[in-house]
Structures are given as structure tokens and as C-alpha cells.
Amino acid sequence: MSQTRKFLVAVGMLAATAGAALAQTYSVGPMKVDQPWARATPGGAKVGGGYLTITNMGATPDRLLGVTLPQAARVEVHEMKMEGGTMQMREVKGGLEIGPGQKVEFKPGGYHIMFMDLRSPFKQGDKLKGQLSFEKAGTVDVEFKVESIGAGAPAAPKHGH
């Protein structure tokens, strides 16, 4: 193998592992939580939104029962959907079931985590430590990275093969 080819292979492997290292992935049992993030909030705001992706890697369903975050007095899982030509937002009561092999994306305009009665504003660049609780898998510690106020989902890292 030529020196140039060896170098390119090494750079490709480094890039692939660096992308994986930058991805925020957390696991508890078969439940995988990817890229938790939140939007920055203006001063005085009492609510904020959190987003992530949950994948059930197991063979049985599980249920997201709740989320906790010290900066919020109350946290709920909400769903937004169109009903009769109007966008409706409601709390998901009783937890959100995630079937075997199912991936659920929490994103603006869909499922999201509603942080309520904020104790302090979320500032871009902050990292908010919280927990997700699943019915069967248990509890997992996560860190929500705070993006800008108008941010969309952060780009997923690209993995080279």
C-alpha cells in the first residue's frame, strides 16, 4: 500500500471516530438516546423546548415515562399535530410507548420535551444535565446541549466507511 493511500485510510478512520466521539449518545438497557438538545430561551421565558431521538434496540416495547431537569420545575412530553386545519399541542399522558426497533424523533413541530417554570434562562452553549426515565429500561443521565433560539436540529455526524 502506498504512503499516500495509508495516509488517506488513516485520515478516514480518524474522521469516522471523531464524528462518533462528537455525537451525544446515551444508553440504558436497549434504549438509545441520541443528540439531546434544547433551544436557548429569552430572559424571563418560563418555558423551553428539548429535542432528541430515542431508539428501542430491544425485542419488547418500552415507555418513556418522564424527564427531569433541575432548571425546570416541571417537565412534560408533548406532541404537536394538525387537527381540523389547526396545529394542536398536547401532553402525552401515561408516557410514550416506543416499540421494538422503533425510532422516535423529538423535533420542533412534532414530539418534544416541554420544560416549564424555568428557574433560569437556557443560554446558547450551556449543557443542561437531566434524566430520562423508562418503564422497563430504567433511568439514564443525559446532557442537553443548548443551541441558538431559532435553531433546528443539529446535523448528525457523518460516519465514513
Question: Model features per residue range: what roles?
Answer:
Residues M1-V11:
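Bacterial N-terminal signal peptides that target proteins for export
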Residues L14-A15:
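Repetitive helical segments and hydrophobic/amphipathic motifs
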Residues G19-A23:
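Sec/Tat signal peptide C-region and signal peptidase I cleavage site
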Residues Q24-H161:
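Compact, glycine-rich, soluble single-domain proteins
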